Amino acid sequence: MKRDRSDYEESMKHIDIVESLMMLSRSFVVKQIDVKQSTGSKTNHNNHFECKTCNRKFDSFQALGGHRASHKKPKLIVDQEQVKHRNKENDMHKCTICDQMFGTGQALGGHMRKHRTSMITEQSIVPSVVYSRPVFNRCSSSKEILDLNLTPLENDLVLIFGKNLVPQIDLKFVN
């Protein structure tokens, strides 16, 4: 069933009316806001936001927030004599393994990499996993090796019990 052209034109009229009403309402709201902002800016725009701790005034809330963060930072009390007698050894970074000294933490980090690699190579010399069953079973001069025609389960049974004790499994498909 098709719509009549008159139904389409009627719905378009409604859409046009709604759009024009929305445009009118937006322009009215914008004018109201502009009036409020212009009156407020003349009276309270300068130094509108005030810090509760030190009573300093700021133009924006963001600036006040950044300033408030500075009140939370701990203040360092430094003795000037300690600064003068500051020893260079205190600024040096010391390797805990070989007691070598470095000027920066980055240099110490690069040096520590040498210790880590030497530890890894020492650990890799000694195998961490010990296998209880040998893959190859040597018996006098003949070698028993894995039979690739058998399943892994059958191979394990052969290695454990020998060929004579393994049950024969027929894997032929029945039609």
From Swiss-Prot:
Sample GO molecular function, one term: DNA-binding transcription factor activity
Key words of the record: Metal-binding, Nucleus, Repeat, Repressor, Transcription, Transcription regulation, Zinc, Zinc-finger
Ranges spanned by the short sequence motif EAR-like (transcriptional repression), renumbered to the chain: 146-152
Location(s) in or outside the cell: Nucleus
Listed InterPro entries: Znf_C2H2_sf (IPR036236), Znf_C2H2_type (IPR013087)
Entry annotated with the keyword Ribosomal protein: no
Domain of life of the source: Eukaryota
Chain coiled-coil ranges: none
Renumbered zinc finger spans (C2H2-type): 49-71, 93-115
Induction: Induced by jasmonic acid (MeJA) and gradually by wounding. Accumulates in response to dehydration stress. Induced by cold, osmotic, salt and drought stresses in roots and shoots, and by UV-B and wounding in shoots.
Covalent S-S links between cysteines: none
Keyword Metal-binding applies: yes
GO BP: cellular response to water deprivation; positive regulation of response to water deprivation; regulation of DNA-templated transcription; regulation of jasmonic acid mediated signaling pathway; response to cold; response to jasmonic acid; response to osmotic stress; response to salt
Sequence motif Nuclear localization signal, location on chain: 71-78
Disruption of the gene: reported phenotype: Decreased tolerance to drought stress.
One Pfam family per UniProt: zf-C2H2_6
UniProt-listed SMART domains: ZnF_C2H2 (SM00355)
Expression across tissues: Mostly expressed in stems, siliques and leaves, and, to a lower extent, in cotyledons, hypocotyls and roots.
GO cellular component entries: nucleus
Comment block on domains: Contains a slightly degenerated ERF-associated amphiphilic repression (EAR) motif, which may be involved in the activity of transcriptional repression.
Record function comment: Transcription factor involved in stress responses. Positive regulator of the jasmonic acid (JA)- mediated signaling pathway. Triggers the up-regulation of LOX3, VSP2, PAL1 and PAL2 in a JA-dependent manner. Promotes drought and osmotic stress tolerance by preventing reactive oxygen species (ROS) production (e.g. H(2)O(2)).
Protein name per UniProt: Zinc finger protein ZAT18
Organism: Arabidopsis thaliana (Mouse-ear cress)
